[in-house]
Amino acid sequence: MYAENITNAVEIQDIRAREILDSRGNPTIEADVILADGSMGRAAAPSGASTGSREALELRDGDKSRYLGKGVTKAVANVNSQIRSALLESDATDQQGIDNILIELDGTANKDHLGANAMLAVSLATAKAAAISQNLPLHQYIANLRGQTSLTMPVPMMNILNGGEHADNTVDIQEFMIEPTGFSSFSEALRAGVEIFHSLKSVLKSQGLNTAVGDEGGFAPNLRTNEEAITVIMQAIEQAGYKAGKDIHLALDCAASEFYKNGQYILAGEGNKTFDSQGFSDYLVKLTEQYPIISIEDGLDESDWEGWAYLTSKLGKKVQLVGDDLFVTNPAILQEGIDKQIANAILIKFNQIGTLSETLDAIYLAKKNGYATVISHRSGETEDSTIADLAVGTAAGQIKTGSLCRSDRVAKYNQLLRIEQQVRASYRGGEEFIGLRG
């Protein structure tokens, strides 16, 4: 009888979804999962601006008379009807079982029936409800799902200067990031990032440059070249009292698919400077030789696997090469990359694949094969901080969650500060990176 009551306590009693707004003022979906014991989990789906063509489908209404076509009432209806009916009385602690039901109910390769946004909100809300029911912090509950015994605090990739699809400026590369590698705790690393962020504002102001921010909270000035963006960040690091290449390293997200046209990489902000695959790879190699860059994300187009092979041969032993649009958090595509020795790291975004279980599959496949894992936000975010718990609970090692302003970004950093206070989790700094390991 006692065991039966325990089982009943974690049964899903109700599921309800609604439209809310993301950080860009666009609708997204939020779901609540309520268990028999009263535990409730709540989660919201993020949304990307630069997206990979093989990502799972984000279901939008397409009704131009409402939210300019970006409404998600269809996704909400799918949760409140089909998904709710399928999951009522299911065991919320059986995450794999819950996600399998969602996948089977959708029945498509790219989640275009239910929508990856609808599925993800329910998948994450279920995990949160189960964690609350078991009186566990979410990061520990996630760790338990795959038997992760050692926890680590992630090194933050802080996007302090925005370009590309994340800003209305002349800079082609989408993200210029700092990585606090030379610190012994997450809180000290975060403090360094904040100080450099404020220092960068001062540097930009002193040069008469715009200090408005982009989608992810980084500054978005008009600059003549990508290299000029790196230069002002180097100045900010020095002005803040830190040493580039020792305390702080740099990272780039090229989002190269956004400026790849007809087999050419075209830097519109630099007078339509044009490269072929090898030429743009060599351009990136040169930047790593001139500046302390230890990570490059989406350095080439998602379809340019031959170019990726060349880039990996040139930099793969000393620079982290991250596949985002390349792998879209998809274990099958990642396995293809592993087999072909393409890149050496994967960016992990829940909504690219649509369920927590599939996300964990991608993380642990990467780990098994020596690929680094970077847990990531999207440019359209909410106050939901689940990715902070995912980063710690999987010992991913790195997190990418924007700049040091905008509450949708800072929410994740604040959650990591709370977790660091609660648990014994090491901060490995530079040891997380292929080019810095001792």
Swiss-Prot record:
The species this protein was found in: Psychrobacter sp. (strain PRwf-1)
BP terms from Gene Ontology: glycolytic process
Residues where (2R)-2-phosphoglycerate binds: Q174, K349, R378, S379, K400
Catalytic activity entry: (2R)-2-phosphoglycerate = phosphoenolpyruvate + H2O
Protein name: Enolase
Subunit description: Component of the RNA degradosome, a multiprotein complex involved in RNA processing and mRNA degradation.
Active site, per annotation: E216 (proton donor), K349 (proton acceptor)
Name of the encoding gene: eno
Family assignment from sequence similarity: Belongs to the enolase family.
Task performed by this protein: Catalyzes the reversible conversion of 2-phosphoglycerate (2-PG) into phosphoenolpyruvate (PEP). It is essential for the degradation of carbohydrates via glycolysis.
Pathway assigned in UniProt: Carbohydrate degradation; glycolysis; pyruvate from D-glyceraldehyde 3-phosphate: step 4/5
Chain residues that bind Mg(2+): D253, E297, D324
GO molecular function, one term: phosphopyruvate hydratase activity
UniProt xrefs under InterPro entries: Enolase, Enolase-like_C_sf, Enolase-like_N, Enolase_C, Enolase_CS, Enolase_N
